[in-house]
Amino acid sequence: MAKLTKKMKAIKAGVDSTKAYEINEAIAVLKQFATAKFVESVDVAVNLGIDPRKSDQNVRGATVLPHGTGREVRVAVFTQGANADAAKEAGADLVGMEDLAEQIKKGEMNFDVVIASPDAMRVVGQLGQVLGPRGLMPNPKVGTVTPNVAEAVKNAKSGQIRYRNDKNGIIHTTIGKANFSEVQLKENLQALLAALNKAKPTTAKGIFIKKVSISTTMGAGVAVDQASL
């Protein structure tokens, strides 16, 4: 059996794994154990009442968090003409068509989000094997294939998160950093849950949001009492 580190022992002693914490208390616990030498991310896992084996029950989408994620996001945009100018003005880091595709084929991928206008998908389609496995392929369901590329760039830069359930019906995403205030983290979490409720499949029956847990990169993980949200 693996030996528990001093930090792991402290977390085990300080966190009640059988308890669902009131949200402010949950955040306070996370902050107490977020002692890494870097600013840890605050991540969330949401267990959904869906059957992930059924395609019509899978949940996928995007939402802009009111306080952002605390990360600087680099955005690449496939578009041309007036849309290219609009994307640059909105803050896109890379804008192009075939030239941008060639960079990506060479392995130059210094970006976190890829956005494309519909007319550019003929170029982006060639990059499926490169972008797909990295979760970077533009998709209209999350707003990354759109005629309004400028708005998509602004959303990505201002703290938009994308979410998709895994094979166990769980959504994993981030809601900020450990140095965010309790109010900022709570409001970001509320925004995510509101977006998930709006995206509830019509075929999903019973309780939709079954469990909400928050954790930091290197620290504690706690269940959240949904009544406190």
Curated annotation (Swiss-Prot):
Keyword tags: Repressor, Ribonucleoprotein, Ribosomal protein, RNA-binding, rRNA-binding, Translation regulation, tRNA-binding
Gene Ontology cellular-component terms listed: cytosolic large ribosomal subunit
Highest rank taxon of the organism: Bacteria
GO annotation terms (biological process): regulation of translation; translation
A Gene Ontology molecular function term of the record: structural constituent of ribosome
CDD domains the record matches: Ribosomal_L1 (cd00403)
InterPro entries reported for this sequence: Ribosom_uL1_bac-type (IPR005878), Ribosomal_uL1 (IPR002143), Ribosomal_uL1-like (IPR023674), Ribosomal_uL1/biogenesis (IPR028364), Ribosomal_uL1_3-a/b-sand (IPR016095), Ribosomal_uL1_CS (IPR023673)
Role played: Binds directly to 23S rRNA. The L1 stalk is quite mobile in the ribosome, and is involved in E site tRNA release.
Subunit structure: Part of the 50S ribosomal subunit.
Family: Belongs to the universal ribosomal protein uL1 family.
Protein's name in the database: Large ribosomal subunit protein uL1
Taxonomic classification: Bacteria, Pseudomonadati, Pseudomonadota, Gammaproteobacteria, Pasteurellales
